[in-house]
Design a protein with these regions (language model features):
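Cytochrome P450 heme-thiolate monooxygenase catalytic core
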Residues: 6, 121-130, 145, 163-281, ...
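Cytochrome P450 proximal C-terminal region
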Residues: 2-28, 54, 303-308, 400, ...
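Conserved cytochrome P450 K-helix/beta-meander segment immediately N-terminal to the heme-binding cysteine loop
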Residues: 363-392
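Transmembrane-cytosolic junction motif
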Residues: 34-54
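Conserved cytochrome P450 K-helix E-x-x-R motif and the immediately C-terminal K′/meander segment
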Residues: 66-86, 221-232, 253, 309-352, ...
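Cytochrome P450 catalytic-core helices
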Residues: 276-295, 299-301, 414-431
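Cytochrome P450 substrate-recognition site 1
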Residues: 47-162, 175-176, 180-182, 198-210, ...
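Cytochrome P450
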Residues: 2-32, 92-99, 161-185, 193-200, ...
Length: 472
């Protein structure tokens, strides 16, 4: 009897709780159901649930792989690791995890297929300050500002309408001087003939000093120099003088840009035209001077197409071997060995591996272009590889070697670089026979700066091929 009473009391208490328990239970079940459905949809949509993590290069506690990156050229260490850990792996640099891509296929997947998930740049505080909070087009995130800046550069400065016999010649010094003049004319509308007074520094700088500050060894005073150059050209424009330049275009069309943004836009145009094109041209001329047979093939092609006419941009589409020389030089001697770091702002996948949001991604261009699965004898300079493979010989494909990136973040200046470099190489070979001085054949190293310049500038012996000179 007592047991029955106790049971009834328990049931009465439970009935009293029913109005409260049922909603709570239903709510919990609903939340559980929604969580399950959300997870199921996410897994089906993204396909990441069962993906393995990226292979990890073993390191030490706390510092990770920092001690293994003692070499001044980390891209070579990245390439060695790829032989052991595969085309995609991760390393730790202190508290940060970095995924390194060493395969063209995986790199293009990141740049093109997964662009929407991996389109941001990850810049240090120092670089953000240097670039006026990511105002540099090449370094900015893929946002409205980047698209606007890229549009201005492509429309004006980078478009198709832009503009002793036995003594070794210092090619780099000679060519850098001419390229710097070209970049100044494009960006500002006028070359620097003598010197410029820089008000903020309180001194007058020569053309060579300005080149060093802006291009070859970027120093703290670059902003002051750019301000003086822009002020001088702005005064010319204000006086009514017609100046057809990138600066003139920005002042007229880009009304939303700040003074600082205009400054860095113009500086970027000068830097890229005067530096990266120099790197590719110098390496190409080194390889041609080293191999007389390949140089002879290029000269014969130019002679057959151009005859006695000087090579121009209009001839380039008829010169497949010259295009092959250009692309092979980019492959073996990419102006940048590692691209600016990317940042995965949402979960994604690469190469069949799970990439969580927040991961930093490094594209090892050097490693991609040394991948033996992609390139036969990658250590050799062989322009003919771009003629034998139909997929690689398309002269309109600037992204086969990843030197210009790929996808929506591809280099805006790829067409300009091709026109300048190919025309320059063609004219130099058309006018002169090139050879290296005795002992110059084996020097084949590069520096570890922003761009991969030759460790020692190219010195070559030039022999005129024709009666007229290069400057005629």
């Amino acid at each position: 009897m007592g047991s029955t009473i106790e049971l009834n009391n328990i049931l009465d208490e439970f009935e009293a709780l029913v109005p409260f328990v049922i909603p709570v239970a239903l709510g919990a079940l609903s939340l559980l159901f929604l969580y399950f459905i959300k997870g199921l949809i996410f897994a089906q949509k993204k396909g990441y649930a069962k993906l393995p993590p990226v292979p990890v290069v073993p390191g030490l506690p706390l510092i990770g792989n920092l001690l293994q990156l003692k070499e001044r050229k980390p891209y070579k260490t990245f390439t060695k690791w790829a032989q052991t850990y595969g085309p995609i792996y991760s390393i730790r640099t202190g508290a940060f995890t970095l995924v390194v891509l060493n395969s063209t296929d995986v790199a293009k997947e990141a740049l093109v297929t997964r662009h929407s998930s991996i389109s941001s740049r990850k810049l240090s505080t120092a670089l953000k300050i240097l670039t006026f909070d990511n105002a540099l087009v090449a370094a900015s995130d893929d946002n409205d500002f980047h698209k606007m800046g890229r549009r201005h550069m492509v429309t004006n400065i980078l478009g198709t309408n832009a503009q002793s016999p036995q003594e070794a010649v210092n090619f780099k010094k000679m060519f850098a001087y001419e390229l710097f003049g070209l970049s100044l004319k494009q960006a500002l509308g006028q070359n620097i003939e003598d010197s410029v007074y820089v008000e903020e520094l309180g001194t007058t700088l020569s053309r060579d000093e300005i080149f060093k500050i802006l291009v070859s060894d970027v120093l703290d005073g670059w902003k002051a120099v750019m301000n003086s150059l822009i002020k001088e050209q702005t005064n010319r424009i204000a006086s009514g003088e017609e100046v057809n330049s990138f600066l003139d275009y920005l002042l007229c069309e880009a009304k939303t840009l700040t003074t600082e943004q205009i400054t860095i836009f113009v500086w970027e145009a000068i830097l890229e035209a005067a530096d990266t094109t120099l790197v590719t041209t110098e390496w190409a001329m080194y390889e041609l001077a080293k191999d007389q047979n390949l140089q002879g093939l290029l000269y014969e092609e130019i002679k057959n197409v151009c005859g006695s006419d000087k090579i121009t941009e209009e001839h380039l589409s008829q010169l497949p071997y010259l295009n092959a020389v250009f692309h092979e030089s980019l492959r073996k001697h990419s102006p940048a060995s590692v691209a600016l770091l990317r940042y995965a702002h949402e979960d994604t996948q690469l190469g069949g591996y799970y990439i969580p949001a927040g991961t930093e991604i490094a594209l090892n261009i050097y490693g991609c272009n040394r991948d033996k699965n992609e390139w036969e004898s990658p250590e050799e300079w062989k322009p003919e590889r771009f003629l034998l493979d139909k997929e690689k010989c398309d002269p309109t494909d600037f992204y086969k070697t990843l030197a210009f990136g790929a996808g929506k973040r591809a280099c805006a200046g790829s067409l300009q670089a091709m026109l300048i470099v190919c025309t320059s190489i063609g004219r130099l070979v058309q006018e002169f026979e090139w050879r290296l001085p005795r002992g110059g054949e084996e020097e084949n190293d590069d520096t570890a700066t922003f761009t991969t310049h030759k460790l020692h500038p190219l010195h070559a012996i030039l022999k005129p091929r024709n009666h007229y000179s290069l400057v005629s």
